[in-house]
Amino acid sequence: MKHTELRAAVLDALEKHDTGATFFDGRPAVFDEADFPAVAVYLTGAEYTGEELDSDTWQAELHIEVFLPAQVPDSELDAWMESRIYPVMSDIPALSDLITSMVASGYDYRRDDDAGLWSSADLTYVITYEM
């Protein structure tokens, strides 16, 4: 399925840079403290666009989420994202072969409200692709 290829292209590009992170194909349900720093690449909201007749065009939100221990400030999440993730996202040749467009759509902070184990920064893009 194309979704696997999309995630793999981003993960491969990120893994080529020495980030020191544990990478996840999909958003993990649980973390071990040894996993930090962690980066998850996943898709949400994938749906058929129906824009063109006889076309199988889809759109989804691509997430690149950085996870660090809960006690780190947002500024540390920002520094991690700005120095290790954002520069890679601007040049992924394997991804450009799979998509028709990619537009930055958001940046959000999250906290583990259940166990208090992690904090995260989630960089999102809206991507369009042919299935």
Swiss-Prot record:
Keyword Ribonucleoprotein: no
Gene Ontology BP annotations: symbiont genome ejection through host cell envelope, long flexible tail mechanism; viral tail assembly
Pfam families recorded: Phage_tail_U
Keywords from the UniProt entry: Host cytoplasm, Late protein, Viral genome ejection through host cell envelope, Viral long flexible tail ejection system, Viral penetration into host cytoplasm, Viral release from host cell, Viral tail assembly, Viral tail protein, Virion, Virus entry into host cell
Entry GO terms, CC: host cell cytoplasm; virus tail
Keyword Heme: no
SUPFAM superfamilies: Phage tail protein-like
Domain of life: Viruses
Localization: Virion; Host cytoplasm
Assembly and interaction partners: Homohexamer. May bind to major tail protein V, and /or tape measure protein.
Family as reported in the entry's similarity comment: Belongs to the lambda-like tail terminator protein family.
Purpose: Plays an essential role in tail assembly by capping the rapidly polymerizing tail once it has reached its requisite length and serving as the interaction surface for the completion protein.
Protein name (record): Tail tube terminator protein
Lineage of the species this protein comes from: Viruses, Duplodnaviria, Heunggongvirae, Uroviricota, Caudoviricetes
